[in-house]
Each structure stands twice: as C-alpha cells, then as structure tokens.
Amino acid sequence: MTVTVLFELRIKPDAVPAARDLMHRPLEVTRAFDGNLGIEVLVDADDEAHWMMYQLWDTVEHDEAYRSFRAGEGKVTELPPLLAAPPVKTRYVTSDI
C-alpha cells in the first residue's frame, strides 16, 4: 500500500540560498531510491524559508529503508546548520475512502 510523507523544513531566512543549492543532489538521490514514486518540494508562497517535501513511497518498508539510509550513510550533514527548527515528518497511508 502506498504511503505519503510530508517532511516539513523551516530554513533560517538567511540560509535559503544555501539550502536551495544544497538540496539538488540529495533530492536526486531520493528520487532514485528504491520505492520512491515521486517527491515534490513545496515552498510557502508567503515564506520562502518554509518548505514542505511531499513524498510518495511504494510501501512503508520502502520509506523506512530510506529513513535508515538518511540516518546513516546518506545523511545530509550540511543541512542541520541551515535549519531554524528540527524537521517534522508525518506519514499518511492511502485509504479506500
């Protein structure tokens, strides 16, 4: 069953250009990761430092494997200093409603 993940980032306002430059490569890796069905980065129209990453995964297990990868060998170590707050991840399962 597919799952949708919303991953919210609050970037330090003065770090937005650096975050934009940084995220190109990690997003390429995410898009190529096994089980990823798509990812879009949404930027708040009123606050360019507020980003929402909309991710679609084939299964919960694919999402979990990706999270493990990002916590280990795929960690984006340059990102935390650019953040104004810790990221917030919310996972949704697709229902039959």
Language-model features, listed with the residues they occupy:
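Short, well-ordered beta-strand segments in beta-rich or mixed alpha/beta enzyme
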Residues: T4-L9, G38-R67
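Short, surface-exposed ligand-recognition loops at beta-strand->loop->(often short) alpha-helix junctions
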Residues: R10-A19
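A broad, low-amplitude sensor of folded, mature protein cores
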Residues: A15-V16, T30, D34-G35, D44
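An amphipathic, aromatic/His-enriched active-site/gating alpha helix that lines ligand/cofactor pockets
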Residues: R25-L37, L56-K89
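Short, low-order "capping/linker" segments at domain edges
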Residues: V93-I97
